[in-house]
Amino acid sequence: MADKALKVGIVGYGHLGQFLVEKIQSEGAEVGLQLAFVWNRNADKLKDSLPKDLILHDLSDFTQRDTDVIVEVCHPLIVKEFGVRFLSHAHFLVGSPSALSDGQLEQDLRTAAKQQGKTLYVPSGALWGGQDIQKMNDSGTLRALSIRMSKHPSCFRLTGGLLSDWTEGEGRRVLYRGSVAELCPLAPNNVNTMAAAAIAASKLGFHGVTGEIVSDTALADYHVVEVDVTGPDGFSVKTMRQNPAKLGAVTGKATYNSFWSSLLVCKGHGGRVYLC
């Protein structure tokens, strides 16, 4: 057990938030984590599973809690509204990195992290090889990056009714292919993997990384993420990740454990953005 437990604030109590809270409650003492607060838009959802003193009713009151790391697992709008403020108080693990497709917000968060000496953590989630992509980016050898995410249509949460007409057995349908910057607002809860890639590949950025989302009724048991990296002189790497997932699940099973592993890294890496 660590000498001093890191105090963690959890913002959001959906499937992932609940998983993290239960994990900290059951294993936190062993790994040096303890809950500072939990906030949910509907606080009634918290009262049967948490002590009253851990429930934060007004998110603006987070500054009144002694917190080392704030974890957002809620919605990109929370990142936009509170991200800079979070970084003035604690390290910030952003579970909705698609919010950073807003170029001004990304710059504001990077600036806040640098000025406050706090780390903006971006979880790699379902992205395989994120650290390698970041190394190529930093060394100037990354030429192109594209990511395809394929899921059963029930697993997408899209704006504008983009997939409202799907029928079981229709097969494969490409919903979008283009810049990740334009994709993020269409599928803010489904493209965090691509957002993490765009942050790792910061020289290409959200406008330079290509994203594709595919609806496929054959994918009843898995989410599939394919990453295609291009470097100089014909260098390329292609990976395919199959992540077990139930029908209707936005997040695959393996991503929960990946997120937990990311949280364990959040012990302070200076005033910068850090892929974990």
Swiss-Prot record:
<dbReference type="InterPro" id="IPR005106">
    <property type="entry name" value="Asp/hSer_DH_NAD-bd"/>
</dbReference>
<dbReference type="GO" id="GO:0033735">
    <property type="term" value="F:aspartate dehydrogenase activity"/>
</dbReference>
<comment type="similarity">
    <text>Belongs to the L-aspartate dehydrogenase family.</text>
</comment>
<dbReference type="Pfam" id="PF03447">
    <property type="entry name" value="NAD_binding_3"/>
</dbReference>
<dbReference type="GO" id="GO:0050661">
    <property type="term" value="F:NADP binding"/>
</dbReference>
<dbReference type="InterPro" id="IPR036291">
    <property type="entry name" value="NAD(P)-bd_dom_sf"/>
</dbReference>
<dbReference type="GO" id="GO:0009435">
    <property type="term" value="P:NAD biosynthetic process"/>
</dbReference>
<protein>
    <recommendedName>
        <fullName>Aspartate dehydrogenase domain-containing protein</fullName>
    </recommendedName>
</protein>
<dbReference type="InterPro" id="IPR011182">
    <property type="entry name" value="L-Asp_DH"/>
</dbReference>
<dbReference type="InterPro" id="IPR002811">
    <property type="entry name" value="Asp_DH"/>
</dbReference>
<dbReference type="Pfam" id="PF01958">
    <property type="entry name" value="Asp_DH_C"/>
</dbReference>
